[in-house]
Structure formats: structure tokens, C-alpha cells
Amino acid sequence: MSQSFAPQQAPGLIGKAGALQLDQKSLAFRASAVMLGTLFLAAASRIEVPMVPVPVTMQTFAVAMIGALYGARLGTLTILAWLGEAMIGLPVLAGGAGGLAHFAGPTGGYLASFPVMALLVGALRERGWNAQRPLLAFASMLAANALCLAMGGLWLAGLIGTEKAIMLGVAPFVIGGVLKSALGAASLVALSRLAKCGDAE
């Protein structure tokens, strides 16, 4: 009696939860993903609305997306690699800036929050807060943005006082955080649908 076996299809890069399936990839592939992630973060930093003392950028969107796409461990590593590039002077921060001075200035608290944001979004993704549950995906990104504003605001308060920190470093970014969280969740849903279409072919 003969048996026929259909060839197993290799898993795609994008999973049905809208995340990248990097765990089973080679070390070289994951290292390349980290490099691409830092480029994505640098590009997002260039999308800027100048404000004083903290500019509006797409950094938090990119950070949350890296956490959601890469997962907690690799996502956090990617953010740390990007911040390392900034520390040695590469022009990867808002407005093409770089250097250690930015970690001690008004934006220091926000920069410090980015690895924690990626860790939070990635950890929640691994617990089902992903594209298959869009509202939870949105909530995870919103929580990460709130964490960023809290850490950034606390740092800024130490430099310019609590009232000014809230007025200049927190309040102007609340609506943007909500919108970027919605955009992030929608992007994950779109990637999830793309993966399903690929599986159907």
C-alpha cells in the first residue's frame, strides 16, 4: 500500500497574528532583521514636526511596531541597537541628530522609554494582544505610548518643572499617541490579512 505525502509548505515570514516569524530563522537572518529595524527607526525619526523642547516624530509608532513585529526579546534588542547607534554619533534620532548629549537633554526620558515600550508591546503580543484581536493590539500600543509619556514627562519635569513638563512634554502628544496606536493596530491587521491571502494561494 503506497502513501503519498504532500510537501509541507515552509512557514511564511508574516504570521496570521500580523507578526514576523523570526524565532526559527537563522542567526544571520535575525541580525539582518535587527539592522533593517534600526533603519526603519532612523527613517521614522526623520518624519518630524518641530516643537520645543520635544519634537513630534513617528518614533513611537516605529518602536511599537518593532515590538509587535519582532517580539519582546528581538524587538528590545533592535531598539537598543538603534540607541547604541545614536550614542556613538550616528544621525539616527529626530532631525538626523546623534550623540550622547541627547540622552541627557529634554528627550532623554523618552529615549530611555523606547526599549521598555518594545518589551511591553512584544510581551503582550506573545500573550495574544495581536492582530487577531485588534482592540487588544491597539490597547497594547496605547499603553506603550502612555509609558513613554510618563517616563519622558518625569525626566523633563526634573529639568523644567512639573507644570511645564506636562504642558510641553505630555499634553501635546496625547492625541498623537492615540492616532499612532490606531495606525499601528491597523497596520498589524493589514499584515495579518496579507499573510492569510498568501496562505490561500
Residue map of PLM features:
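Generic alpha-helical transmembrane segments of integral inner-membrane proteins
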Residues: 35, 39, 43, 65, ...
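Membrane-embedded alpha-helical hairpins and interfacial helices in multi-pass inner-membrane proteins
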Residues: 128-201
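Short helix-capping/hinge motifs at transmembrane helix termini and TM-loop junctions
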Residues: 45-48, 52, 89, 94-97, ...
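Alpha-helical membrane segments and adjacent membrane-interface helices in multi-pass membrane proteins
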Residues: 48-120
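Short helix-perturbing small/polar motifs within transmembrane alpha-helices
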Residues: 3-22, 29, 43, 100-148
